[in-house]
Swiss-Prot record:
Protein's recorded name: Regulator of telomere elongation helicase 1
Reactions the enzyme catalyzes: ATP + H2O = ADP + phosphate + H(+)
Placement of sequence motif DEAH box: 250-253
GO MF entry, a single one: ATP binding
Role description: A probable ATP-dependent DNA helicase implicated in telomere-length regulation, DNA repair and the maintenance of genomic stability. Acts as an anti-recombinase to counteract toxic recombination and limit crossover during meiosis. Regulates meiotic recombination and crossover homeostasis by physically dissociating strand invasion events and thereby promotes noncrossover repair by meiotic synthesis dependent strand annealing (SDSA) as well as disassembly of D loop recombination intermediates.
Span(s) of short sequence motif PIP-box: 1160-1167
Pfam families noted in UniProt: ARCH_RTEL1, DEAD_2, Helicase_C_2, HHD_RTEL1
Assembly description: Interacts with TERF1. Interacts (via PIP-box) with PCNA; the interaction is direct and essential for suppressing telomere fragility. Interacts with MMS19; the interaction mediates the association of RTEL1 with the cytosolic iron-sulfur protein assembly (CIA) complex.
UniProt binding sites for [4Fe-4S] cluster: 145, 163, 172, 207
Amino acid sequence: MPRVVLNGVTVDFPFQPYPCQQEYMTKVLECLQKKVNGILESPTGTGKTLCLLCSTLAWQQHLRDAISSLKIAERVQGELFASRTLSSWGSAAAASGDSIECYTDIPKIIYASRTHSQPTQVIRELRNTAYRPKVCVLGSREQLCIHPEVKKQESNHMQISLCRKKVASRSCHFYNNVEAKFLEQDLATPILDIEDLVKNGSKQKMCPYYLSRNMKQQADIIFMPYNYLLDAKSRKAHSIDLKGTVVIFDEAHNVEKICEESASFDLTPRDVASGLEIINQVLEEQARVTQQGELQQEFIVDTSSSGLNMELEDIAKLKMILLRLEEAIDAVQLPGDDRGVTKPGSYIFELFAEAQITFQTKGCILESLDQIIQHLAGRTGVFTNTAGLQKLMDIIQIVFSVDPPEGSPGSLVGLGISHSYKVHIHPETSHRRAAKRSDAWSTTASRKQGKVLSYWCFSPSQSMRELVCQGVRTLILTSGTLAPLSSFALEKQIPFPVCLENPHIIDKNQLWVGIVPRGPDGVQLSSAYDKRFSEECLSSLGKALSNIARVVPHGLLVFFPSYPVMEKSLEFWQVQGLARKVEALKPLFVEPRNKGSFSEVIDAYYQQVASPASNGATFLAVCRGKASEGLDFSDMNGRGVIVTGLPYPPRMDPRVVLKMQFLDEMRGRSGVGGQCLSGQEWYQQQASRAVNQAIGRVIRHRHDYGAIFLCDHRFAYADARAQLPSWVRPYLKVYDNFGHAIRDVAQFLRVAQKTMPLPVPQAVTSSVSEGEIALKDATLSSYSLSTRKAISLDVHVPSLRQKSIGLPAAGDPESSLCGEYEQQTFSAQQRPMGLLAALEYNEQKAGASEEQALGSSTPSLRFEKRLSTEQKGGRKKVRLVNHPEEPMAGTQAGRAKMFMVAVKQALSQANFDTFTQALQHYKSSDDFEALVASLTCLFAEDPKKHTLLKGFYQFVRPHHKQQFEDICFQLTGQRCGYQPGKSELESKLTLSEGVDRQLDPGQHLNHGQPHLSAHPTSKGHTSHCTKVGCAVEKPGQPAVSDYLSDVHKALGSASCNQLTAALRAYKQDDDLDKVVAVVAALTTAKPEHLPLLQRFGMFVRRHHKPQFLQTCADLMGLPTTGKDLELEGPRDESPTVPPELTHEDLKPGPSMSKKPEKTQSKISSFFRQRPDESVRSDDTTPKPMQLPPRLPHELMKPHRSKQ
């Protein structure tokens, strides 16, 4: 590799660096050698990541060699030169500018990125260099943990709590192996990213999370996300020592926002209410344990028997603190116009002091909250969500992050930070949306409009100064969009002696930039608030896009100011037919709001652009979205970028208003000649930096080229043009006539295509978060359903979605549940069948109807599976094949396998198990209604899974295909390609040789119906039907519909949705406690709803009825154990209960293996104990519940939010 000497340091570079790259590395070395901070801007595509790595690692190696040389010389001469500088040992040593006594270790390099996924790209660049340092990548448990039980936890904080619990008890064998195997392991390559850590940890049976933390001690360079550095809590949790380190923030244009957000919070009424409910649950649980201990004549009350080492008095005090905090927030008077009230930052200490949360008590409170969270870690159910408690812990740590000096009151700290913070209390506006959540504790809090406590930091200098105070040697901020550098440095309020604003490496024939103030029809283009939704402006913008799509080859990017503007534009273009015109030229792909589905959409876009038969594609995205931040649209993926407006922040948002006021106040304090940003300047910079990030997608390397269209008349203003990057401004031209702009850009692109070298073909994939195996990228990019999904505008524009007529809608779970319970056929008892058997049971296809539904795809993937491994949840092996001999996508089995892989990636493990069970049940029973009910629950409620519902068409039997297409169209608005003339032919082909090989010979004629099966029909399942697939009418079925209708009328749609979801889960897991917890929470709030709880007995399985009767007696306040309580419907096999709930041969749940106990159900601990209730000891002698005298009785009452 070429070597260049910069500032006395020899740098190995993969190729001869360009002048701007040499200048960039020189500035980096200047920061390192002088131990000063630097702000370095270099346009996207100039190789700044490579320059950063090579220059910093060269300096680190240079310093290591210099110190080694000094030590060798000392030993040879037998003299100590501790007081002499390294310069005495030659120019090589002098380049560092440090003395030997300054070092005990070589300074570590900390490379911080915005997301968890970006370090993978940086490590990929590192592997292309000559340097092989010791590397460590720090990630979260969500990316690194391989423990099955911890991975099942739904939230990140629950994963953390359960992990800590297992580590403390030494019950995680993966963690136990880290210390034993860390030194023994043979790491083939020293440069490991997240995926390598996970693979290596799984192979060696040791925890990747703690393995990476061990590797941190010996690492030369450490990669981590921003928040691990900027958030004091994260720094402490990951034991990050910053003393003497070199800290690099890549993509640093986001640092200001992340600094402020890491020191801010919003506390909602739901957060406090959920925390109170959890504490109340623990309080009653511990009181019950204490009572049982007294009844057993234990002379010491020991609550540790339940796993929680806390006194009842301490738990009660914690509950009182939260109650007082809630009262203090509610007591704040607000103006009547819902604007909220703003107070200085020091007010937060006054407010918390009313709840007895101070610098003196914070330690005990945090310790108590942590103990409760650890105690509940690993529990499942609706009443064990500890997110509220975890948020309260985080809030206390944020407020009291800086301890006051010894002997000084905490109020001095409040006065010191009041200038950087504001307290804003405002009415909660999202309480209606909160009612849709399935958490039973949140629905109570959401019945009233509470107050949100916001504590906002407006100065990123707080976090930056804290970094400097930690002893950071050098701080380097770099990005492609930092201009103007002076104001960017002023915001941080720390010195940055070294600054650089680099030019681009491209020539003038590689970039075309045009400001287009008017559309083809002469209408002014504007995204201003008063014009952005006008029909004239939207129509002109759509016509401009259509014309630009004609001349720009390959990939075209369109950036909107916000999601609402993009959705409104798409809606209008769809209605006016403009979207259809663009799609005819370049298919439209839309950036989803949900980040989880982004990778498959962008992969589908890449695939469409790379297709030789296509004219390219159009990708619609938003400024500040994922597509505009660090994603690669090099070469054909992005030949043109259209920016449709200036993305200003919402001007009336309270946080934006207060930020601008804060900056104006700071500028006023600094005097007339102060250089601080004004609020208006900051407001304009927020828009310009978002635009600069978006246009940076077009030029990604030295030989790339492209065109930039700025389609807003305000870009023609001098102040807006001055905010554009310095490398763009020389190419800028304003076009008063749209036709002239099209003429010039067409000429530019024709010349560029002829003169620029052809791009090297390469597989481009989106950057997904670490821990996601390569299988996801491969399957989703090759699976053509993702293309269909991505270009479906209806998915992304709510107003364009088709409405369901005559069938249960996706958002109407009670209707679908009625269909699930009332329209089922009797199923024959079948022997268990594996997943591959269900996969390969596909009718042979005649014609291209399914090809049309699935789309054409030619993936180069071959899957190697073992049935036993698949059934046990083992990993799939994927082998990439460059030239497969037999493309599997062309076969029915190949498409089926690819579809199943895509489904498994899209669903959780529990939902995927439900899907496979539904598939097997359909195969054995031909029960189409039950199948549709299951698929609707899994796929119809989430728009991003609509394509998977459509893709299931290939598994549907011929006589059900037309019905399935109708249902699919009404649920998703998508057709499956059904052709009536071919249904009879398909039916005949189901008895072909291919099916004979896949089905049991005894089931060929009837697809598994019991009346023709070769196997004996199960007892009680006699059928009088002579048609395949017809339903048998069952008495009592209307009771199910009547019950769900009554629930809907009494409790509302949201509560009915919760009940139906819980009932479906009960069918699957046989967990009575879980379903009763939901039903009881919904039906016991008001006395008139108690009959709904009693009537729920029609769904309870026979082996659960004694326990359910006892629970009902407890909840309804009856003194008996349920003997006098009659449930609606017969006690035994009720005709209203579906067969799936009464079959004794179902897989037993956790409660089927033992007889029902006479103890109270878990759910009862959530509700208030009535005075006449009693707790039974082992001798069954009733005794009133007694609490310790020191415990206030009013604290034992469950918390109920005010109506």
